[in-house]
Amino acid sequence: MNNLLSKFKDFVGLNEPVEYEYDYDEMEGEQYVYPQQQQTPAAVPTQEESRSNRRLRNRASATTATTASTTGINGVVQQESGMGSVMNNVIGMPGALNGMSEVVVLEPRTFEEMPQAIRALRERKSVVLNLTIMDPEQAQRAVDFVAGGTYALDGHQERIGESIFLFTPSCVQVRTQTGLVNEMSQTQPRPRVPNSGSQVWQPEQIQMIQ
């Protein structure tokens, strides 16, 4: 009887434990596979996340652009400072920007000291030249030399005493009791005695000699 029942069950399909286990294993495998398939779409960002990421990227790009513009401004400033340094290499007139004027008093003994007066005038300094201790001929030569240099520099000259002269650059105005001295007063050169060897004979004198 048992054999008949078992055969009948086998024929009907009631005794299929293996198939049930196989189906169970198959369903269990599908359960393991299905969560993986569900996790895969979860990795795709949603619209809100994409918008937030886009905002972050826009902010990052704006920050980068601001940094680049700041760097560009700094570059321009550095370039301008570089130009300022180049301009600082240009030598200006001494004493013209500091608002201070300087007066140099010279009491030369020889004519070889006269270039000091010209050098001081080129440095925009006034010169008081005291020639009382010099030989008269050397003193006249010194005055002519310094006066020529002052005239070349568009300066001014004024006699302030016996053998004492004031030479000023063009940036200095000289005022006296009579008024403002705008033009350079030339010194009176000493009359030169013509050399007898270079005397020019007049036609009448030549006729008398003949």
From Swiss-Prot:
Keywords: Cell cycle, Cell division, Cytoplasm, Septation
GO terms for biological process, alphabetical: division septum assembly; FtsZ-dependent cytokinesis
Disordered: annotated span: 36-69, 182-210
One Pfam short name: SepF
GO CC terms of this entry: cytoplasm
Source superkingdom: Bacteria
InterPro entries named among the record's database cross-references: Cell_div_SepF (IPR023052), Cell_div_SepF/SepF-rel (IPR007561), SepF-like_sf (IPR038594)
Location of this chain's protein in the cell: Cytoplasm
Bias-annotated ranges (Low complexity): 36-47, 59-69
HAMAP family, A to Z: SepF
Function: Cell division protein that is part of the divisome complex and is recruited early to the Z-ring. Probably stimulates Z-ring formation, perhaps through the cross-linking of FtsZ protofilaments. Its function overlaps with FtsA.
Subunit structure of this chain's protein: Homodimer. Interacts with FtsZ.
Stated family: Belongs to the SepF family.
Protein name (database record): Cell division protein SepF
Organism: Trichodesmium erythraeum (strain IMS101)
